[in-house]
Amino acid sequence: MLNFIASINELFWGAILILLLVGTGIFYTLKLKFVQVRKFKKGVSQLTGDFDINGKDADHNGMSSFQALATAIAAQVGTGNLAGAATAIVSGGPGAIFWMWVSAFFGMATIYAEAILSQLFKRKVEGEVTGGPAYYIEELFNKSFLSKILAIFFALSCILALGFMGNGVQANSIGEAMKNAFNISPYITGAVVALLGGFVFFGGVKRIASFTEKVVPLMAGLYILICLIIIVINYSNVIKAFEAIFVNAFSMKSILGGFLGMGVKKAIRYGVARGLFSNEAGMGSTPHAHAIAKVKNPVEQGNVALITVFIDTFIVLTLTALVILTSNIGDGTLTGITLTQKAFEAALGYSGTIFIAVALFFFAFSTIIGWYFFGEANIKYLFGKKAINAYRILVMLAIFIGATQKVELVWELADLFNGLMVIPNLIALIVLYKLVVSTSNEYDKLHNL
């Protein structure tokens, strides 16, 4: 089973998806005149514009821009930053980190476009504001039958990729971390995480927004601080770590007969795959949060959205990678969260393992909340609000099952379903690009940007 899924992913995550993802990012970068550079400062200035620690702004009409940002980051900053960075390094070498940066830079333009479209096409479903790629995919080709099929395909893929398999990955990493740090059975961990998740799920959008708004800034800030401390401790290896990243990304051993050899192919495959799983640009996941932000203009949420990719990949994921690469503990036998824990343990002792276990619990659990929410938007699209309670129970079951499965199989399945989401979303982004560009340009003229 594992080998079969891995073979499909090798084909799926080969040149086609890589070209689609990076190509779309390059396309929007050029069309929007390097929007990720031009509007970076603007996006940062909007980050805390309407912060509400009590989550009072979240209701059936949506949530505040900051809460949408926090929900998006909650989904992005998870095992993709901790276990995913380690998996990328082991599977694709240090060079995979470089390709994460490349995909993230162009992904900032992609997610800017996703946020604008999700805002433009959000709607009320049975009295509640909702939105996401399925809603703008449906607008393709004059709302033809084909566009409806693509929208349904995306919605189903999203529910499977995030609500079920994706959350299984998060639970799997939590279970492995808790077993390594505290020798707690994955069955116990799975049950606890499922019940805690259910508590938030059944609280609706207000409880979700309140949770992410409070937890995300605290957990990300503390994690960044600890990473910086470890990198300072390992300062003598920092230059070597960057050398390994850049040299491995373009290793001469990779050139074979005019084609990319296995070295660079693996670095790109795992770098882009893990990069997507981490920052989610182009996947079509975070637009569900950005869609329901209460903003005056769709572009305002686009400005905020591109900052989320920067925080996720260029800050959190990069710091994780540097901790691993400067620790000198990788021998090829450690994978996933175990490698990350050992890197922290090398600098901080056993307390490093404890810290990663606790950090991963909060990172992954917040991602579970975010991904549940994204899946719920597609449940509403396909079946209406009547199916939400059944979906909540099934996600809780997926969390419990995911916590007890082998990490390789769960990761490979997540890659597969993530890829299935990408295709219809990128088709919509390309077809609707004129709308994105015109909306962005109008805003820029109005604000002299």
Model segments located where?
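N-terminal alpha-helical transmembrane segments of multi-pass membrane transport
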Residues: 1-79, 90-95, 107, 400, ...
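Membrane-interface loop-to-helix entry segments
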Residues: 20-27, 32-44, 154, 171-178, ...
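Helix-loop-helix module between adjacent transmembrane segments
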Residues: 24, 28-29, 103-127, 138-172, ...
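Transmembrane helix-loop junctions in multi-pass membrane proteins
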Residues: 31-36, 80-85, 162-174, 197-211, ...
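Flexible loop linkers connecting adjacent transmembrane helices
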Residues: 34-63, 87-97, 109-145, 330-347, ...
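Alpha-helical membrane segments and immediately flanking helix-loop junctions
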Residues: 53-90, 126-134, 138-140, 156-159, ...
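Selective recognition of specific alpha-helical transmembrane segments in multi-pass small-molecule
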Residues: 106-114, 191-205, 216-236, 269, ...
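Extracellular/periplasmic helix-exit of transmembrane alpha-helices
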Residues: 112-126, 228-244, 252, 256-259, ...
